[in-house]
């Protein structure tokens, strides 16, 4: 599906899958058919069961920017034309680290993105020494 925003000179494309998993990878028919100055792709997947792909495959599709979803942790090292923003909030105790959104601009083919932390809560791994003498109240004091 493609939605055009002529006032912004931008088109946004996305491809959904009908099954719970799509292990087949990126499809040739998803290649960018340019209709606007800026072409953005929304793509969900990236692991072995949910549309496996690599950066090079995404780049070959020819979009100016690809907003990636499925991985809950932001990829802060992946800059430029393709980026996982992660989830706005951690969704389970394994979601350690920053959470937020990506804001960006595309001007004359140049893409700039910035990760903006926005989570109101976070999971932390804490090492706390406890012994037989420690009360619940003392443990709470250490946690603060």
Explain the meaning of each model-derived region:
Residues 2-6, 85-144:
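Binuclear metal-dependent phosphoesterase catalytic core
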Residues 1-83, 87-100, 105:
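His/Asp/Glu-rich metal-coordinating catalytic cores
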């Amino acid at each position: 599906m493609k939605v055009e925003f002529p006032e912004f000179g931008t088109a946004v494309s996305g491809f959904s899958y009908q099954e719970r998993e799509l292990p087949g990878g990126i499809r040739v028919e998803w290649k960018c058919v340019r209709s606007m100055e800026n072409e953005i792709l929304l793509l969900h997947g990236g692991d072995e069961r949910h549309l496996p792909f690599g950066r090079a495959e995404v780049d070959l599709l020819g979009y100016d920017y690809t907003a990636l979803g499925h991985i809950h942790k932001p990829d802060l090292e992946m800059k430029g034309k393709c980026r996982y923003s992660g989830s706005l909030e951690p969704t389970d105790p394994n979601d350690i680290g920053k959470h937020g959104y990506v804001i960006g601009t595309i001007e004359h083919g140049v893409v700039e993105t910035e990760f903006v932390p926005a989570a109101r809560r976070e999971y932390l791994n804490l090492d706390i020494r406890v012994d037989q003498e420690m009360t619940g109240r003392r443990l709470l004091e250490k946690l603060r």
